[in-house]
Amino acid sequence: MKLLCWEKSIHGS
């Protein structure tokens, strides 16, 4: 699931 990839990016802001 690529969701975890970009999700960490937005949440890591």
UniProtKB/Swiss-Prot annotation:
Consequences of knocking out this gene: Reduced nodule number after inoculation with Sinorhizobium meliloti SM2011; remaining nodules are abnormally spherical and contain a few small rod-shaped bacteroids, their development is impaired. Bacteroids development is arrested at stage II-III and they undergo premature senescence in cells of the fixation zone leading to the formation of vacuole-like structures as a result of symbiosomes fusion. Reduced mycorrhizal colonization by arbuscular mycorrhizal fungi (e.g. Glomus mosseae and G.intraradices).
InterPro entries: ENOD40 (IPR013186)
Pfam families: ENOD40 (PF08247)
Keywords carried by this UniProt record: Nodulation
Stated induction or repression of this protein's expression: Accumulates in response to Sinorhizobium meliloti inoculation leading to nodulation. Induced by the root-knot nematode Meloidogyne incognita at the nematode feeding sites (NFS), and accumulates in subsequent root galls.
Tissues with expression: Expressed at low levels in roots, stems and flowers. Accumulates in nodules at a high level.
Origin superkingdom: Eukaryota
GO BP, one annotated term: arbuscular mycorrhizal association
Protein purpose: Modulates the action of auxin, and may function as plant growth regulator that alters phytohormone responses. During symbiosis with rhizobacteria such as Sinorhizobium meliloti SM2011, in response to Nod factors and under nitrogen limitation, involved in nodule initiation by inducing dedifferentiation and division of root cortical cells (primordium formation), and essential for bacteroid development during nodulation; this processus is repressed by ethylene.
Further comment: Enod40 mRNA triggers RBP1 translocation to cytoplasmic granules from the nucleus during nodule development.
Name of the protein in question: Early nodulin-40-1
